Amino acid sequence: MVIINSGNPFEMKYIKEEKKMDYAKESLRLHGDWKGKIEVVTRVPVENKDDLSLAYTPGVAQPCLEIQKDINKSYELTRRWNMCLVVTDGSAVLGLGDIGPEAGMPVMEGKAVLFKEFGGVNAVPICLDTQDTEEIIKSVVNIAPAFGGINLEDISAPRCFEIETRLKELLNIPVFHDDQHGTAIVVLAGIINALKVTGKKKEDCRVVVNGAGSAGVAITKLLLTYGFPHITMCDINGIISKNSLNLNWMQQQMTEVTNLEERTGTLADALKGADIFVGVSAPNIVSKEMVASMNKDAILFAMANPVPEIMPDLAKEAGAKVVGTGRSDFPNQVNNVVAFPGIFKGALEGRATQITEEMKLAAANAIAGLVPEEELNENNILPEAFDPRVADTVSKAIKDLI
């Protein structure tokens, strides 16, 4: 593989012998041709006066009156039963950062495409021109009656934590921040299978999570819920402890349940004797020496994109047994698309009012279970994004808990 760096990490080209494509250039060209990736398609004929009178006035008044008497009828008489909102403020879009609502729209449209193509769920992207927490909460609450679920997307930490928590308290429909929980669910699914491959037990594993933003916090919380007792979080300054400086309120909360040994030092110090590394941080920050200092048959999920914390071949050379990344050109891709479409499909079909921790665990177990025991190996711990079983399997796991 040849890596060509133009200076912009999102313009890097990963060229294999059998496939040479400049994804940035080709995607820009296609977006110009598409002029938007989604559109409204009507489900009813309007070919004569009777059709018009049934779809609109005067006939439409009757379903309006029925919904007025019982708002739950909105799920039966409108598209609300299978419609979610994808909402962002453009403050943390991919690895591009704070690029604003207009520039975030291609990603939000793409997310809507994934909802539909992988889960059969209709999604409407909304990009808000505010980064004020209260304004975002108010905006979502005011528009929520039109939707069956809310997917928060690309909102920077720590505001995303408060926004999600408050919306869950205020609304009686599922609210889900995919950057947090979708990532955490797929990571846990991969780790569940990686433990089988390595023969390690969760009770004995020391876990290091590098990156203390939205994804890192959510991954840590879900791993704790699953039963990993020994987790250390790190950020750009090294190991996070109760004595760390410049932590936000959520990171301070996490010091109460992680790094119980009160260790200090660098990421390299944290990795000594660790069994599992989960990186949602920055490229090339883990060396072969650091991997070699981990326990035998280490598990690494290096998910910085487009360049991971360490390249899989280097990690394997240093002794790692299982390596996952966020990229499709390496084995064990950690891809949220195996989680969120099925989660929303199940939540909407089951008319859930929230997505619980038990549902997240069930989704992770369902995803892990899609890889048969006889096919499980260090290069095959997660199902492919295009596996047609994924959404229905995850959906069933969610509905079974409603």
Residue ranges: model-predicted function:
Residues 1-20:
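N-terminal amphipathic/basic-hydrophobic helices that include classical n-h-c signal peptides
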Residues 125, 151-154, 175-178, 209, ...:
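General beta-strand structural signal in soluble alpha/beta enzymes
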Residues 252-322, 327-329:
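Rossmann-like adenosine-cofactor binding region
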Residues 94, 101-119, 171, 177, ...:
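Glycine-rich phosphate/diphosphate-binding loop of Rossmann-like nucleotide-binding domains
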Residues 178, 302-402:
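Adenosine-phosphate binding glycine-rich loop
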Residues 14-173, 395, 401:
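N-terminal ligand-binding/catalytic initiation module
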Residues 32, 75-80, 116-117, 142-144, ...:
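Solvent-exposed alpha-helices and their adjacent loops that cap or buttress functional pockets
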